[in-house]
Amino acid sequence: MPQSWEELAADKRARLAKTIPDEWKVQTLPAEDSVIDFPKKSGILSEAELKITEASAADLVSKLAAGELTSVEVTLAFCKRAAIAQQLTNCAHEFFPDAALAQARELDEYYAKHKRPVGPLHGLPISLKDQLRVKGYETSMGYISWLNKYDEGDSVLTTMLRKAGAVFYVKTSVPQTLMVCETVNNIIGRTVNPRNKNWSCGGSSGGEGAIVGIRGGVIGVGTDIGGSIRVPAAFNFLYGLRPSHGRLPYAKMANSMEGQETVHSVVGPITHSVEDLRLFTKSVLGQEPWKYDSKVIPMPWRQSESDIIASKIKNGGLNIGYYNFDGNVLPHPPILRGVETTVAALAKAGHTVTPWTPYKHDFGHDLISHIYAADGSADVMRDISASGEPAIPNIKDLLNPNIKAVNMNELWDTHLQKWNYQMEYLEKWREAEEKAGKELDAIIAPITPTAAVRHDQFRYYGYASVINLLDFTSVVVPVTFADKNIDKKNESFKAVSELDALVQEEYDPEAYHGAPVAVQVIGRRLSEERTLAIAEEVGKLLGNVVTP
């Protein structure tokens, strides 16, 4: 007899719970809203394991390569902390510590025999968003109808990371459909922010944001079609890289709307530092992914591009544009302060900072919103209805059910509109450079209109999604935290739209006190090396080279 969707979900939750050994179970869950420091006082991790999980990925791979740490030691530490993270934040879809430790033992045996690492990530545990396929495990994408189907092979990126020496131990939670910036589905429920359980961890790579935020992971792999790497990074006070399409391999990953080629989802890392973002990116590019994924551009890591930024920083400074309002939705006071703080730090260090006028972001936001629903939402609704489960309420914030499926001629016209908009934006970029008499190195902007938002209150995607439409490289840099004593409600606010009013009405200085605040550093398309270097400079000036 077919099982109901509720029974299928309950079975999955029961199977997931059994993957946590009894000795790693939290006996009494903390009552406090913030659980960010709970792993340190849980008694589950030893002092040595705490030290490992508090270290950077760059430091860990250095010690693993030198034989100062074994992969089993490092993997066990992160498995234990990930188990705690799962119990506190509900951040996992799959957890497989036994397989991870077996993989770690194989790597240790290789090192003992050959006296060298297998690759740049030798022995390092890396957490994977549920989209990445790992042979033998489920990829549900937050759909109940996808449960009980086991992957017969790895995604290309999974293969690349495995070749580089990474260890896999967890696949993290995503929202139903992937198409929202809140992580909730009918299988496991809601994933929460470890800094405050009343705040969203972001989405769709929300499980990655939560697990890396609480240091149950050191490098997390996410994806981004409308902010899904950058928003979880921002909400968890982390760094996140949204590379341009074609830089890192996406082949053989699961996705909603597969075959949609107008705006591409991209894959990238979430970490505690730019150094670790760079480690991940260089390690993957070192595996020559263009030989495995036909959409990847044959472009190895270009150190010369990083060096150009280093030279500019040393000799006269960078030329940075900035904006704090896209003309559609005004950010909350903490975000406005975050942009102001970043701009002031850059100016104080001698960099040139100039206001940037966002170009037709209302058009860009409207266009990409129509692209998301170009099939009339048929793809996602098919996978939702297949099990009889209801759609999560958040879907209506991004996928408009009133938009009808487009025909081929309308699709071609959409492609042309996107291309024209991209070229118009490049023209504005060039005009700014001609006016300044030098390159515009990057633009500083909000990534969301809110600090880490309260559950089910994420309304506006435009600060993130327009960058997807333009396919610019973007790096999220954590700035500060909301402060009720500084970030007072804007009493003179006048809305430019109903959505603008709705977002601003959500702001409560008390409720948002302590919420992470971030900005994004936006570079030209395929400018990963330069944009990472600029983000590193920004993080250094803000005192956030490595986040806690």
UniProtKB/Swiss-Prot annotation:
EC no. given is 3.5.1.4
Looking up InterPro entries in the UniProt record yields: Amidase_CS (IPR020556), Amidase_dom (IPR023631), AS_sf (IPR036928)
The enzyme's first-digit EC class, named in words, is hydrolase
GO biological process entries: amide catabolic process; regulation of amide catabolic process
Instruction: Report the catalytic activity.
Output: a monocarboxylic acid amide + H2O = a monocarboxylate + NH4(+); acetamide + H2O = acetate + NH4(+)
Instruction: Keywords in alphabetical order, please.
Output: Hydrolase
This protein is called Acetamidase
The domain of life is Eukaryota
Induction (free text): Acetate induction mediated by facB regulatory gene and probably by amdA regulatory gene. Omega amino acid induction is dependent on amdR regulatory gene.
Concerning its family, UniProt says: Belongs to the amidase family.
Q: Which GO terms describe its molecular function?
A: amidase activity
Gene3D superfamilies per record = Amidase signature (AS) domain (3.90.1300.10)
Per its UniProt record, what Pfam families does this chain match? Answer: Amidase
Active-site residue list: 129 (charge relay system), 204 (charge relay system), 228 (acyl-ester intermediate)
User: What exactly does this protein do?
Assistant: Allows acetamide to be used as a sole carbon or nitrogen source.
